[in-house]
Structure formats: structure tokens, C-alpha cells
Amino acid sequence: MDTSQVSVSSQAAQRQVRVQLTSKQEDIALPDNTGPILVPTGLKRYALSTLVNNLLGNDKPIPFEFLINGSFLRTSIDEYLTANGISAETTLEIEYVRALIPPLHIASFEHDDWVSSIDVLSTSSPASAGSDAIARGQERILSGSYDGFLRVWNMSSQVIATSPSPTDGGHISSIKAAKFISPSSIASAGLDRTVRLWKYTEAEDGFSGKIVPQVELYGHKSGINSLAVHASTNRILSASADHNVGFWSTKKSDAPAAPESLLPSAASRTSKRRKLNASVSVSQRGPLALLSGHTAPVSDAIFDARDSTVGYSVSWDHSLRTWDLVTAALVDTRTTSHSLLSLQHLPDHNLLATGTSARHITLIDPRASAATISAMTLRGHTNAVVSLARDPHSIYGLISGSHDGTCRIWDLRATKTDKGGAVGESVYSISRKSLEEEGKANSKRVGGEGVKVFSVCWDREVGIVSAGEDKRIQINRGEGVLSSS
């Protein structure tokens, strides 16, 4: 090695910097009177973790991650100082958090066909807000399948209830979206172009239940790809292949009449109710509004997480659109370079996460004052990103489901900067258990063939629930996967 290189390396090892170690998690925080500590700039994460454990006097070491200016330290302190033009004379504020806890496989529930959509009912899920009907340990999972049936499962992988057949008020084609509205009501939609509302009841013992059709909502002229529910305002958004976003009421009395041209039979045009058989009749209603503007199939639509009068939608036309749901007016359009397939609001960061056909996730600031369209790009998937969900434990966490057969967990603090701007890499990847059971855990399926993930949900009690082409619901759980600080 060149003597000058040896000298530079030696100087880096000998350099020191004052660091102020802090944590927002009270149970691992150092005493308030802990002042700045002089440490070698050559230290990396492992050495810093050892230092903090020694200062805390831990008998059993806790693995820590370290953040400087909101980003994880992935190099030595010296390399960080050099890359960011910071003097070693500066007192460096370093925050530490518990390191990632990998989510473990808990269970898998098998279906007869592809599972397109899942939702969870738990004490913390949106559908149970204001209700004491769900107790811890009585969580339910709702699945929608390509076989046209809804199923409600308990946590022991038992099917408690199944929706009726088409002749008894069920879907007549594949289901693409299913959501709990409340502990006693469900919404679903699919390739039969209808949004359907259901009453859900359980027997007292909790081992059996019924899914009974209540209302059929007509308005779309092509299949429906996704649903979003805002229970407290009795509203639903639907994203359809007909290029429109549907805006609906879950209250039959608030909904207008169904468009006669879209009703399934000539007989129904003379009646508000369709007689299915001697015991079943289902009300038919129309949309509050159809939001027009997209020029290609709409893949996803959601409510603003903090303002239910605002909606967002994404489409194969490469655009993200913002809607005023009070006036049904288009407010803003952000155009990207790729088809957008999934959508999730990150309100604490004023960002919308959009899954793309180009295998990455683009974070977009929807505010009119935003200078650029893309605030950050998350890279790691090898096929289309079709489902997104927020981490219920951390404002920095996000999970994605992809046609590559994996779910990836992202921490918005785990970023780096390249010529294209801020780029994030996933902190954990969850593969399909079905591959492992086939003895093919390390084999790569081209494009995720046979194991494509179609839907993912992240619930505080149940964990990470995903479903897809392998005809399974898969549950993974890790307590506090990401730090919430």
C-alpha cells in the first residue's frame, strides 16, 4: 500500500469527534446529564451499538441503529463527515433506536383460487373505531378471491363465513377488492362492475357467521380494481377500468337511484329491487358522483388520511389526481413517467406513496407548492408494485406488495442521495412461505410466477397480512419492526 494511503487511514483512525447520543424511546434513553462523548471517527454502527450498551449497563446487548440528521448511518462517522462536509470540530447529534426486528411467519390460510384482496378487523383497525365489538384475540381477516367469494377467517385459520353464490346475491365474477366498513358491514367489488354492501353477523360462540347482501351499487362500466372506505362519513371510493373514480354512500337512504342502463336485467328496470329468489331481495343504488379525468384504467383511489373531503387516485395514464369530493371537481394532476398501480397516504410527511409498473415506489408531494413531483424513490422490487400499506407502529414505515412475489418493508429514514434525488432501499423483504414449503425458497421465479402478491395489509395486532397468486393468506409478525421515533 502507498505510504500516503497508510498515513491518511491512520489519521482517520486517530481523529476524534464529540457526539451527543440521544434516544426518543424512554426505556433505552441515557440519563439527561450524559454530555457529549469524544469518540474515534472510525467507529461504525456495531462499535457505536457496543458503546451505547456499555453506557446503559445492559447485561444483554440490544442491537441499535443510529441516525444523523434523520438518516441512518451506513458508513463510519469519518466517511459521513467527509461526505456531508462537516467538520470534526462539530458536536455531532446522533440519535439511536432499536434495530430492525425481522417479522416471522405466523400462519398461512389456504384458498381454492387466487386471493386478490385482504382486510383486517381488530381493536385498532379503522373499521372498529368507536366500537367495542372486537376484543383482543377475536381478530378477523376478510379475503376476496378470484372465485367470486368473500370469506371471513378467525386467527386459527378457520372460515367463519362465506358470501353467497351469484344466485343468492353474490358476485358473478372475480372479486378484486374487499373492506370491512364496520364490525357488522363489508364492502366488496370486482370484475362484475358492482360495489356490493353486506351485513356481517356472527353466532355467539364466534365459530360461525353470515355474510348477507344488502345493497348493489351500479355506475361503473368496467371492472373495479380497488375500494377505499371512510366509515365515519359513510363514503366509499372505487377505482375502475372504465377510467372513472366512483364516489358512493354506504347508506341506502342517501344514495340516488341506480342508472337503469347498467342494471343486470330488463325486469330490474321497473323496480328498485331485484328479486333473486323467494328469500333474497337486494336494493340497487347509484353513485353520488363519477369522477372523470383519467385517460386510462384507474388502479387505486383513497381518501386523504386527515380530510375525508379530499380524494386521490392513480392510473395507468401515469397520473396522480387530487379530487374535491364535496364538489366532485378535479383539483390537481401530477404526471409521472410510469403507470401507477397502488396508492397510500403518508400524512405525517405530506407525501403520497405510489407503486409503479417500473418496479419502484415514487413518493409524491401532492401540495400545489411542491417544487418537484418526486420527493423520493424506493427501489428494490423486481416487478410491478401493486399494493401499499402504512406501518401502524411508526410514521416512517411502509410495506409494499409486488408481483415479484415479495413484500418489502421500507423505512423512510433509510435513504441515500444520488443524481436523481433521494433513494430508499428496503430494510426487510418477506418472501412467500409457499416457496419455502416447496423447497424452493432460494429459487427465483421469473416475474414472481405463481407467487405474485396482490394485496398487503399491516395491522397493529395481527401483523403483516399478504395474499396472492399462491392462493394463500400469509401472516408475518415482528413486535415493533421499525422504531417509532
UniProtKB/Swiss-Prot annotation:
Stretches with biased composition (Low complexity): 255-268
Keyword rRNA-binding set for record: no
PANTHER family the record matches: RIBOSOME BIOGENESIS PROTEIN WDR12, WD40 REPEAT PROTEIN 12, 37
Alphabetical UniProt keywords: Nucleus, Repeat, Ribosome biogenesis, rRNA processing, WD repeat
Main location: nucleus
Domain of life per record: Eukaryota
WD repeat start-end pairs: 110-163, 170-208, 219-258, 293-333, 335-374, 380-420, 448-485
Protein name as annotated: Ribosome biogenesis protein ytm1
Role this protein plays: Component of the NOP7 complex, which is required for maturation of the 25S and 5.8S ribosomal RNAs and formation of the 60S ribosome.
A molecular function GO annotation: ribonucleoprotein complex binding
Region (Ubiquitin-like (UBL) domain): 17-98
Subunit structure: Component of the NOP7 complex, composed of erb1, nop7 and ytm1. The complex is held together by erb1, which interacts with nop7 via its N-terminal domain and with ytm1 via a high-affinity interaction between the seven-bladed beta-propeller domains of the 2 proteins. The NOP7 complex associates with the 66S pre-ribosome. Interacts (via UBL domain) with mdn1 (via VWFA/MIDAS domain).
